[in-house]
């Protein structure tokens, strides 16, 4: 929500840069490159908020995500869907549509949490809280 309300043209350019490279990384199956671009995208979105607390939270979350990347738990077949979702988030922010941006980001986060739970269940055989 804050990203859509506060994003400047310069902020949007920083969000669009990794987003523009994500489709090629997804298409060619370059998982590490895609995940690095994903981290850059989310950091740029956090910077759009101009809220240091949210930026710091994103930095901390990036550290956790990097651990997941090293474990290789992102399936290649999810990348194309991810590109589309990220593009929708960017478009909502660029339109300064805070309601859509917040809804899309919440759905994105919820999807990530559900995916992580499924991975944990598949790897450890029990449902995670």
Language-model region placement:
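Structural signature of alpha-solenoid helical repeat scaffolds
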Residues: 29, 74-77
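Short alpha-helix boundary/capping motifs
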Residues: 73-74, 85-86, 93, 117-121, ...
